[in-house]
Amino acid sequence: MKRIQAFVALSMAHLAIGQDINYSDPHSPAHQYHTRELNDPFTRMIEGFETGERELDYGSGRAFIASLLEHLNVPVSSQLLVFSRTSLQTRYISGKNPRAMYFNEDVYVGYIPGGKVEIISLDPDLGGIFYIFDQPKSGELPVIERSGRCMNCHAVAETRRIPGLSLRSVTPGPNWGAIETFRNKQIGHQIPLSQRFGGYHVTGDAGFTEHKGNRIGREVGGKVITETLEPGTQFDWSIYPAATSDILPHLLLEHQSGFVNLVLEATYRARAYQYVGKGEINPRHYAVLQSLGEELVRYLLFADEAEFPAGGIKVDPQYCEDFLADRKKASNGISLKDL
């Protein structure tokens, strides 16, 4: 009987989704994405950056990004390097000039030597708030603008159509654009490790090599032939604040992105459903939210997490220390951040 009830509930959820409203429309009065007062960490700091109250180091690109990260409480050790041209500033990115990414629980920073700085700052109601600005020259103050172009990649199917977090895994070709794509329209810790990290550098002795990182490719006779691109062989580590692109921040970013996008979809759906129902949620929409709730619980419990190597994974101790620095302990001394 329970199996029949579960099947009926799931069928109702799928039916509801098929007949669904456009829950993700940012212009909807339910969301007011572009006009609602913002409550994300970076927005609250903008005035301080633009007036110089929050001082930044303009000595070099490396010094600038390091000082910005310090203000945002984003650890330098979270650095990930991506050499595929799979983001907004494609003309700057290559194996000779990788794009660096840094993150904590609420703010995500993109830095390309010679390019613009990109920010995703999470608003609890609206999701990702996107900013982009030039790296100021010495003596100048930053002019920070909210970006709408980022939504072209950060509010699509793989982000559950809400302003969320986007991750891709590709094989870059000779011009650093994608010639092969993996895990299409999927983000989260359920993705097999063998399908992850394409277009990124992975440093350190992680203990396994069955992933798509550190590879470039070319098409030969209709097939993609790949070869290893060792980190640091085409660029100088000294222009970045750290000399790592470690496996642990890779894994945590994947897990975190899947969680954030799932929570934001539930938030957007619930708000949209309440709006069209004038404060009420009808049974059809309730079934959708119930299905999402069950998916969220499974995600929180790591029920469908991809299998790890039997011997575990070796990680950068510096990032471990930085990640655990703000852990909040329960009464028994353990924390959800414990690794």
Language-model segments: what does each one mean?
Residues 43, 62-70, 249, 290-301, ...:
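Generic detector of well-ordered alpha-helical segments enriched in charged/polar residues
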